[in-house]
Amino acid sequence: MEGNFLNNPWINCCFVTTYAGVVAQYFKKGAEWFNFTTPSIGTFTNEQNEEDSSNYSTSGYDSSAETISANSSPINRSGVRSRISQKQRQRILKEAHFKAQQLNRKMVVQKSCPPDHEIKPVPSKFYQFDAITDFGFGGPVLLVGMQKDVEVMKLETKEKARSGRKKNRKSKYKCNMYKMTKLAQIVAKIPKKKEVIEIDEDGFQKVSSKKAAKLRTLKPADVPTPPTKVVENKEEVIKLEVIEQPEPIVLPVSTPTVTFSRFEEMKRVVKVEKAQESAKTKALKKSKAISISRHVGFLQILEKLEETEEKPQVENEKKVVVKHVQSARKNQKKGRKNRKVEPPKEEFEPYEEDHYNFKRYFLIIGVYVLVFIYVCTNVLTVGVSYEFPYITLANKNVRAINSTLPKSVNESSFLIR
């Protein structure tokens, strides 16, 4: 046992409360002036009296009449909140830990220590009760708290590993581009083995291994230059020749004086076309335009227009054909594909109503005649008179008689003529 009996760790709260009650009755004053509290560890109260007091606050637990107040009742407890969240709890614990560290620094007694040492607080193993004789109200005040011991520890300094220079964050695309460029630079620095290229007399590369070597672009000095013949490319001069059209063949066709539409005009041309075919082939063989086969359709249209229109109009059409031939030759020189101009399709003239009706009636009459002839050949014999119904009946009777007679008798002798 140390100096004061209150330092005994086995003294419990029951003894302290009874002791406080006896003291209160002795002074005959109510318990309002006396506050018995549980120690709130880590809260510093008295900075002046460091030697006498334990420097801990005792304002956490009240044994006075305030505990029976209306605020502490569960009904009138309007300020009580629900359970705090995890974030709030973590923040409160962090703040409490920070305050505890500050208090520990203040509680440390400045003792003489060597320069390489440091003073660190170490908590005691049990609660230590201290009775302080302060007569604020004419009587003693009991403070209960925990005291912390202080030890001198050797200072250990550890050098922190310094990290490299921080780079600015880049986007994923830029990072990949940076890597690609870096790899390309590294690959470019790697020296490549130069392959010896051997060339034959014919100018081909020799391949020694099984795998064919990759052909590379050789310098002009290394490549053997075969003898070349310089040929001057003469520019092709195309002379546009006017196509000589054959003289129009005049046929004995009655030219109408009335102006026709284009459709009627084409119908009339189609009628004359067969008569002109023989003359056209002879004329085309003589002309120079037979070599350009794709423009035969235009020439045929020209010849058809010659028959119907006057000569000045034909000359205008000739100029159009010449221009078309010129453009076709230019396109042929450039290498473009020209579409073949197909000749106009023959449009047959439909039958007129009178001719159509006449043929229809003629066919119907012919069918009736054929049916009549067929009936006559099967029912009547040769040389039938106009009264054929009666004769047919008589002939049937005669045939019935002949069927009973022998075959030697001639059947035709009994027929009615």
UniProtKB/Swiss-Prot annotation:
It is a single-pass membrane protein. The chain crosses the membrane at residues 362-382. Residues 44-83, 325-346 are annotated as: Disordered. The keyword Transmembrane helix applies. Disulfide bonds: none annotated. Keywords: Membrane, Transmembrane, Transmembrane helix. GO terms for cellular component: membrane. It is found in: Membrane. Its main location: membrane. Residues 326-339 have a biased composition (Basic residues). Residues 54-64 have a biased composition (Low complexity). Residues 65-76 have a biased composition (Polar residues). The keyword Transmembrane applies. This is Uncharacterized protein B0310.3. It comes from Caenorhabditis elegans.
